[in-house]
Amino acid sequence: MKNTIHINFAIFLIIANIIYSSASASTDISTVASPLFEGTEGCFLLYDASTNAEIAQFNKAKCATQMAPDSTFKIALSLMAFDAEIIDQKTIFKWDKTPKGMEIWNSNHTPKTWMQFSVVWVSQEITQKIGLNKIKNYLKDFDYGNQDFSGDKERNNGLTEAWLESSLKISPEEQIQFLRKIINHNLPVKNSAIENTIENMYLQDLDNSTKLYGKTGAGFTANRTLQNGWFEGFIISKSGHKYVFVSALTGNLGSNLTSSIKAKKNAITILNTLNL
């Protein structure tokens, strides 16, 4: 209880600094973020979507480091699929009755539940329908990380695993700019592709009724000793002001893949207390 009070008071001080400071420089939220990301190498970024002003940041070095996007790649893939008219909001992805690794994946899915439950087999079905060349073109148009969709060396698995702790890498800073392009409708895709993707990312209202849109991602590194975790997306205030954020981490969190849960929890804690 005392720790919670201390963290909330520290965040209150940071909010006061953000509101009343006449400077436009970003606020370092280390006092708040350090205990939240304890035991991991974490990063948090919050930007004004319109002006590209950095509102708050934690651990700039980590935020500049590329890592596999894991299931956050579904955001980019959703844009591609809707733009190429491979899917629409009424699409049903039919389960083939074979076990898919998680119980929630063993059923038919929609574009919304594909995003909500991070259904890998749906992503793999979509990538194969779009095709490697077209995906590469989209990655270039999106300026998405290192744009490497080759997959693991000598495994020829780019279309099915490039984003899953494999060849495709992107930094939290690069994710921020990608998210800004989405929320500002500044990508060379159909407006409907952007609108449908954003709609399917909606999760909940924050404590102050600000709307939260987001996507998690998680994966074990090659030696399975560390986990990468993501939570990223948009918040839209009651007044309509838009922000983009990324929470990311790398750490030894045991054998259960919980890194994205931690990244999401940390982000929501910070966003709720910032009360934007």
From Swiss-Prot:
**Which is a GO BP term held by this UniProt record?**
antibiotic catabolic process
InterPro entries on file: Beta-lactam/transpept-like, Beta-lactam_class-D_AS, PCN-bd_Tpept
- UniProt: a beta-lactam binding residues: 71, 74, 118, 216, 218
Catalytic activity, as annotated: a beta-lactam + H2O = a substituted beta-amino acid
Q: How activity is regulated?
A: Inhibited by penicillin sulfones. Only weakly inhibited by clavulanic acid and sulbactam.
- UniProt-annotated catalytic positions: 71 (acyl-ester intermediate)
Q: Which domain of life is it from?
A: Bacteria
* Cellular localization per UniProt: Periplasm
As given in the record, the signal peptide range reads 1-25
SUBUNIT field: Monomer.
According to UniProt, the name of this protein is Beta-lactamase OXA-1
Query: By which gene is this protein encoded?
Result: OXA-1
